[in-house]
Amino acid sequence: MPEEAETFAFQAEIAQLMSLIINTFYSNKEIFLRELISNASDALDKIRYESLTDPSKLDSGKELYIKLIPNKTAGTLTIIDTGIGMTKSDLVNNLGTIAKSGTKAFMEALQAGADISMIGQFGVGFYSAYLVADKVTVTSKNNDDEQYVWESSAGGSFTVRADNSEPLGRGTKIVLYIKEDQTDYLEESKIKEIVNKHSQFIGYPIKLLVEKEREKEVSDDEADDEKKEGDEKKEMETDEPKIEDVGEDEDADKKDKDAKKKKTIKEKYTEDEELNKTKPIWTRNPDDISQEEYGEFYKSLTNDWEDHLAVKHFSVEGQLEFRALLFIPRRTPFDLFENQKKRNNIKLYVRRVFIMDNCEDLIPEYLNFMKGVVDSEDLPLNISREMLQQNKVLKVIRKNLVKKTMELIEELTEDKENYKKFYDQFSKNLKLGVHEDSNNRAKLADFLRFHTSASGDDFCSLADYVSRMKDNQKHVYFITGESKDQVSNSAFVERVKARGFEVVYMTEPIDEYVIQHLKEYKGKQLVSVTKEGLELPEDESEKKKREEDKAKFESLCKLMKSILDNKVEKVVVSNRLVDSPCCIVTSQFGWSANMERIMKAQALRDTATMGYMAGKKQLEINPDHPIVETLRQKADADKNDKAVKDLVILLFETSLLSSGFSLDSPQVHASRIYRMIKLGLGIDEDEPMTTDDAQSAGDAPSLVEDTEDASHMEEVD
């Protein structure tokens, strides 16, 4: 008597995904088999790993394999594995009621035009079964539970019931009820083609139940019976009478007996045929492996639908022995920088036995995009995660993996087109490496690429920059900001560019962290053009003019400092401005304006740190600008002129904005601007305003307090 089934509803996102898979036309449906074989391989990995510390786990079935059984009569394709199996709660949770983190991300990618073959990268590969099947049953037996069956025709729900039919021992059996228009997936040749294409490097035997013919020798009357049937048919078809020769009966009987011994018939039978007999690719000589084989192995390893960008195959021998195969993918995974997610990019083997695929100590976090395998001869087979953390062998392997990755990236830099593809995807990883890896900082700095004031639309390396430096240039000049357009038009680069010096544009938030650790490159100090103390090479006449300007504007600087009070640390004459009247620079050791903006955007920022790390501001004025010169004349004429005070505040707030800072009271600043506009248009302050005007003016501080001062305002161009 069949057990009563429990019915469950699919979680909303999963139901939506299944609907998308079923109702959308996809040309490459064959990937369903790759995904199910990959899942089976993962289940086998898990039971093998558990058995290393507890061999009794394999008492329920010693042999580890994957088996494919096509049945044309029933219209089903069955995939069996002897892996870890699933408990009842695993079936309910993993196959329907709990959405994986990648479910939503995959749907969004699909709707944006991504390929269905990406499904495995998002952890929802099982549902690809519905590309070719209208009903799926999953029978599973875990060592810790009874045998259960999961079943669904994808109508928004699924059932789970206890299963008392043929026992599996341990593992999972998936039966796909193939759609009528997809029966080619029941053909042996098609299945072999797909396995060879996608799964030939799976580490367990993949067996296909094939139908064959063989000749069978018979010594009984079976062959005669078949022949008699055939002869009777022929007799009925002809009118000629049969003539018997009685005298020859004895001879005929003797001949018949001899003939019976030799007669053979053809019979059909089934047997398992192993489809993936290739030995692990990393154990072979790199000279004997084609790029196509590397490509197929990479896809099999990672579930990626695209080829890899670069590969490094090497072995280390001596006191320590291991082989490794490292790949750089073409694009970043959707969850590259999710801190809580455990990476499974580098698979660790010990003497060809899979140990684990999420060993965090195998490669540093900034290289977590690398994929591949490491096969050690020296680690113990039953090593635990805790033991790994203390293991000296692993530390040596890690050091070698980082070194070889650096070599691989360096080789990639020689191919400009491919390196651009790599850098577009993984530049943040390299920059994170500069921040975190002091041992490889200099090497990683070689890999960085930036726009500069001389590079146009192309990126260039710091080495290119240094090679173009002028004879009298001591430093590498850089500016950080939000975009190339913003920094290239910044007041800070005016004088540097006018002198013919190149400026590096750093426009990613992570660049701010890079320059905290990258203080110099090839002996040249990196100098920010937005911070105090900028020194530019100058001749005697320029030095003399600067000293004269300093003396000439000394009184204005003091006045501006007294007006601005603690808003700025000091006011000085600038040597970096050409077209702008003034700018705000920060102290050497505080944050730049860009870093301050980034930190203010942090949701969990430390307000105490904000207080002392926000750099002390310094106002620099341009002695050659007409606004500053006119302001000096007005201040010399009357230090107590209220218009001068308002103009100084207005200049300060405007330079804050143009230097990349934000205003504490933007509304007050806006009101000052509106008053200036009114004065410029000749609108009398005493003229009655409309309600809207009154609201917009708000509590704006007056620019001037009497009409006499108003006339002073109008004099400033």
Swiss-Prot record:
What stretch of residues is annotated with the motif TPR repeat-binding? 713-717
**Subunit structure comment from the entry:** Homodimer. Forms a complex with Hop and piwi; probably Hop mediates the interaction between piwi and Hsp83. Forms a complex including sicily, ND-42 and Hsp83; the complex is necessary to chaperone ND-42 in the cytoplasm before mitochondrial import; the interaction with sicily is direct and is dependent on its ATPase activity. Interacts with shu. Interacts with Nup358 (via TPR repeats); the interaction is required for the nuclear import of the sesquiterpenoid juvenile hormone receptor Met. Forms a complex with Dpit47 and Hsp70aa. Interacts with mora.
Q: Which domain of life is it from?
A: Eukaryota
Question: Is Cytoplasm found in the keyword set?
Answer: yes
Q: Where is this region: Disordered?
A: 213-263, 685-717
Instruction: Return the protein name.
Output: Heat shock protein 83
Organism name: Drosophila melanogaster
Supply the gene name.
Hsp83
* Comment on protein domains: The TPR repeat-binding motif mediates interaction with TPR repeat-containing proteins.
Q: Briefly, what is this protein's role?
A: Molecular chaperone that promotes the maturation, structural maintenance and proper regulation of specific target proteins involved for instance in cell cycle control and signal transduction. Undergoes a functional cycle that is linked to its ATPase activity. This cycle probably induces conformational changes in the client proteins, thereby causing their activation. Interacts dynamically with various co-chaperones that modulate its substrate recognition, ATPase cycle and chaperone function.
Give GO BP annotations, semicolon-separated: cellular response to heat; centrosome cycle; cold acclimation; membrane bending; multivesicular body fusion to apical plasma membrane; negative regulation of cell population proliferation; oogenesis; pole plasm mRNA localization
**Residues annotated as binding ATP:** 39, 81, 100, 126, 385
Q: Where in the cell is it found?
A: Cytoplasm
Keywords of the record, alphabetical order, are: ATP-binding, Chaperone, Cytoplasm, Nucleotide-binding, Phosphoprotein, Stress response
In terms of CDD domains, this protein maps to: HATPase_Hsp90-like
What InterPro entries does UniProt report for this protein, alphabetically? HATPase_C_sf, Heat_shock_protein_90_CS, HSP90_C, Hsp90_fam, Hsp90_N, Ribosomal_Su5_D2-typ_SF
Q: Which residues carry this modification: Phosphotyrosine?
A: 294
- Tell what triggers its expression: In contrast to other major heat shock proteins, this one is also expressed at normal growth temperatures. It is also developmentally expressed during oogenesis.
Question: Mind telling me which Pfam families this protein's record contains?
Answer: HATPase_c_3 (PF13589), HSP90 (PF00183)
Q: What is its main location?
A: cytoplasm
Q: State the phenotype upon gene disruption.
A: RNAi-mediated knockdown is lethal at third instar larva stage and shows decreased levels of sicily, ND-42, and ND-30.
